[in-house]
Amino acid sequence: MTVPASAVALSRRSPWLGAIEDWLWQKPSFRMVPDLKLPLTPAGTAAPARPGALRVGFAGFPSDYSLAMLLGLIDSGVELVGLATSLGANPAISGENALSQIADHMGVPLLRLARINEYDSLVALRRLEADLFMVASFDQILREKALAIPRLGWINVHPSLLPKYRGPEPLYWAIVNDEKETGISFQRVIRGIDAGPLLLQRREPIRPDDDSGTLARRLSQLGAESTREAVELARSGAAGSPLDLAQGSYFTSIGHRRIDQAESAALADRMVRAGNPNMLAATQCGGRLCYVVKVCRIPASDLSPGPRLHFPDGDLLLEQTVDRCGCHHGQPVGTCPHDE
């Protein structure tokens, strides 16, 4: 596994952050689920940024994807002045998690905000005196008062080729819809969902065997490598290119979709890969419901042993199933609120 080629070694500022970066990029698959806790105990404190560095805040969740973007931001040489996250997405956000561990190590506050646009949240954001805020996975829409706090505004990093696949599940829908290419986009934040002007975009092919986890890892690497350039564009006052939303698309969040109700084996296969590892697909298997991690498409004439589903275009062999949902609820089969 490779690390972002353009990253400055975090160990120059903090051996612990360098070790966390090494640990993260050894993962073959990234999760978007906001329950990440770092395996290494923070040691010491990070060295300060260079004098005169841009003061930047970060808003996101404790997930592999957000952590990669945060480390890329720190790598870019800015002065990290604070972190913000959104309460309610997962119980882990209220306790010790990847964001709180890094905030403690960097000596900056972590704001756990239930409603970012309310008065107390705005006061807390102003106290950070940030020049710029970067967002990577955040489930609240910022209004004008919040947007006006940092003098250089907010930038959002989104894992799709905007304006395509705006919304909370771009990786899922790109795989399900059999797209051949996606990417990472940096944009100005305006009031709206992934609707602001585009600052920077990088493209990435979708491989035939990709699931959401392998694709998320490569897009995270693209994002981490591009963060320095995006920050410099924001610093320079670049307005960005307006998105033509009429030429784009918006897709909603999804649950544990039932592949036994899919119209074809090809679609069911894409649903399984798209749902792994964040929102696993589900099916009836041996008279009970289960979550599906891995399948194999085979001809109907193939007599390979194991549970299978039949479709007009062939069969789907269920190679790996589990009894817990794997999403941020972490519930046994049949009890997750996202079951369909």
Q: What are these regions, as identified by a protein language model?
A:
Residues 119-129:
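Short amphipathic alpha-helix with an adjacent loop that forms part of the alpha/beta core around
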